[in-house]
Amino acid sequence: MIFDSNYDLKDESETLRLAQNMAIHLHPSMNLYLKGELGAGKTTFVRGLLRGLGYQDKVKSPTYTLVEPYSLEKFTFYHFDLYRFKDEHEWDDAGFREYFNKASICVVEWPEKAGHILPEPDISIELSHESFGRHIHLMSHTSLGAECLKAAI
């Protein structure tokens, strides 16, 4: 069963709240892909996910480091930003494949920069600027993703 839904978010607090609600239902081995133009709120959404998972320290954008790992109590959360990739093979060359495993959650901003090399996401999230704030499109690609989204919304 696929979950596919759209929501309007009037401000940053609504974006954070939605992400925090979703985080409660995430499981190790899940992959989430975030799409949207620069400044659309992708890193804000990741910050909300991490807050929902109990992480309270600073959340940095991995634009220049490419990946920021967050060691949580039961698993590692990897936040990727592939914006600077010029070629999909840079993902493989960077050795990121090993991060996608049953003991971690991987969240990837700009997944299209890695082409079809990335594993299938459980959930894809697209954020866009609107006159009222932000618009978010949530879509599951696996049954685990659908369960997570249904429970969170």
Give residue spans per PLM region:
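Short phosphate-coordinating micro-motif centered on Lys-Gly-acidic
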Residues: 3-5, 51, 86-89, 97-153
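Phosphate-binding P-loop
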Residues: 22-29
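Conserved lysine of the Walker
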Residues: 42
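N-terminal pre-Walker A segment at the start of P-loop NTPase domains
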Residues: 1-21
